[in-house]
Swiss-Prot record:
This is TATA-box-binding protein. Transmembrane segments: none annotated. Sequence repeats lie at residues 10-87, 102-177. It comes from Cenarchaeum symbiosum (strain A). The gene is tbp. Keywords: DNA-binding, Repeat, Transcription, Transcription regulation. One of its GO terms (biological process) is DNA-templated transcription initiation. It comes from the Archaea. Belongs to the TBP family. Coiled coil: none annotated. General factor that plays a role in the activation of archaeal genes transcribed by RNA polymerase. Binds specifically to the TATA box promoter element which lies close to the position of transcription initiation. GO terms for molecular function: DNA binding; DNA-binding transcription factor activity.
Length: 182
């Protein structure tokens, strides 16, 4: 029996925000923590990465920003605020407030043992398992989450919009697997 209380481990949080103004590509290119190349994506974006960031922030000339690679919502939002601060301090954008929004939380769960996905996939409504195409079983969650379940007992949860939704989805996944005979 799989323990439904097994906590998921967050591996990536994607969040976005908008500066609600255009960003100066020339000034952004001069920033030491920014990677900007006009040849990449037609010069429409640059990347801000500082030593304190777990991931990086993509900054579009339109002012939209995407934070990827953080392992918590707080860190992801912090990356967006830090990127905004660097843009303002270097004159690439005017001072403004941002309102970060979580778009996706990706986490892993380890069941601690093998899961017989070949046997239980037929007992799980909506499960997709085709070992010739992909070695894992794909499931849709109750909320916006999707699951990948591998025979090794490793699982991936993607699509959560909050830590609470992630915990509910993890509990739901493990309960459904138990009910199917895992």
């Amino acid at each position: 029996m799989l323990d439904p209380r097994t906590r998921p481990r967050v591996v990536n949080v994607v969040s976005t925000s908008d500066l609600v103004q255009r960003v100066s590509a020339k000034k952004m290119a001069a920033m030491p923590c920014c990677m900007y190349d006009e040849a990449v994506y037609g010069g429409r974006c640059g990347y801000i990465k500082t030593p304190g960031m777990q991931g990086r922030v993509t900054v579009f000339i339109s002012g939209k920003m995407i934070s990827v690679g953080a392992r918590s919502v707080r860190a992801s939002f912090g990356q967006l605020h830090e990127a905004r601060l660097h843009l303002v301090r270097n004159g690439a954008a005017g001072d403004c407030k941002i309102r970060p929004v979580v778009r996706n939380i990706v986490a892993t769960v380890d069941a601690g043992r093998n899961v017989p996905i070949d046997r239980i996939s037929s007992r799980m409504p909506g499960a997709v398992y085709d070992p010739g195409s992909f070695p894992g079983m794909i499931l849709k969650g109750l909320d916006s989450c999707s699951f990948l379940v591998f025979a090794s007992g490793k699982m991936v949860i993607a699509g959560a919009k909050s830590p609470d939704e992630l915990r509910r989805s993890s509990f739901d996944l493990l309960t459904r697997l138990n009910n199917a005979g895992a």
